[in-house]
Amino acid sequence: MARGLNKVMLIGHLGNDPERRETASGQSVVNFTLATSEGFKDSSGNLQERTEWHRIVAWGKLADICSQYLKKGRQVYIEGRLQTRSWDDNKTGDKKYATEIVCTDMQMLGAKDSGGGTSDASYSQNRPSYSRPSRPEPSSGNYGASPSSGGAQEFEKDDLPF
């Protein structure tokens, strides 16, 4: 049986501060809305803008980070999957449905003052964090020396192979 693909990638602005709760087992969960906008031309050729609102849910450590750093208006990149859940409405007895994006990766974008937090920070629910290895110090020799430090050599035009 062939596997399907359920992947969502969005860049938008938070419509509200994340609402943090805990499950009965103590696991963190946050919910927030994300607005994405796109431009299009109407039948008259006028430029219009359409905004789509998305329900986002994050769990565990990612939920804790979202509740701590994200604020209304903050621009973020969200990666996740679509999930539809259903429940019975206690008042009407009707079956209700909600489609939301289960967030597995989040990156804060934009300036610091656009909703708080640190710019360009990220967290992924699925992937381990890796840090860039430190750059080794140059060993003896003048590999990275600047011309002013005597590392460059003068060549005669006749010595060059081209």
Swiss-Prot record:
The keyword Metal-binding does not apply. Residues 110-162 are annotated as: Disordered. It comes from Chlorobaculum tepidum (strain ATCC 49652 / DSM 12025 / NBRC 103806 / TLS) (Chlorobium tepidum). The keyword Transmembrane does not apply. It comes from the Bacteria. Pfam families: SSB. This is Single-stranded DNA-binding protein 1. PROSITE patterns: SSB (PS50935). Homotetramer. Residues 122-140 have a biased composition (Low complexity). InterPro entries: NA-bd_OB-fold, Primosome_PriB/ssb, ssDNA-bd. GO terms for biological process: DNA replication. GO terms for cellular component: nucleoid. Residues 5-110 form the SSB domain. Residues 141-151 have a biased composition (Polar residues). GO terms for molecular function: single-stranded DNA binding. SUPFAM superfamilies: Nucleic acid-binding proteins. Keywords: DNA-binding. NCBIfam families: ssb (TIGR00621).
